[in-house]
Amino acid sequence: MRFISPALALLAVTWHTVPVSPKGSLRPAGLHRPDSADVVAVAEAFHAALAAGDPPTVLRLLAPDAVILESGDTEARAEYAAHHLAADIEFVRAVPGTREVTGVRVEGTVGWVTATSTTRGEFRGRTIASQGAELMILSRIGRTWLIRAIHWSSHRL
């Protein structure tokens, strides 16, 4: 059994609903928004899918070769799906938190979003009080932005 690190606290976020176009498209509704808004919308949709307990949407937003870096470990998308996605969903749904996007940048077909978070609550009998940081790197393939890498880090408050 893997220890749930404080870095998971970054996942427990409060989000507003992000409209997604019908038929499960990865592109949010409002097709004419600037790229930076689209990049942020994909990051928000990822967190909203975690909070909703929606693994298929989480995985659709991750590129097939995506990597997740957390607590000194690196996982490929398939490893994340098989080993930690369910625990991340459980954590996000159990522990309240806030998240704030602190930056977004787009250079051609690559974009990145930085965010910070604060999470407080209890999870599996442990008190959680942490501050987190997130970096998501996305790439645009055609008109679709996909998450290529996520780096989560956190520390106790």
PLM ranges: what are they?
Residues 43-54, 62-66, 70, 84, ...:
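Sec/Tat-exported extracytoplasmic proteins
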Residues 3, 11, 15-29, 112, ...:
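Short beta-strand edge/turn micro-motifs at domain boundaries
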Residues 46, 58, 66, 80, ...:
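Hydrophobic pocket/interface hotspot
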Residues 3, 15-64:
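Short, low-complexity N-terminal intrinsically disordered segments enriched in polar/charged residues
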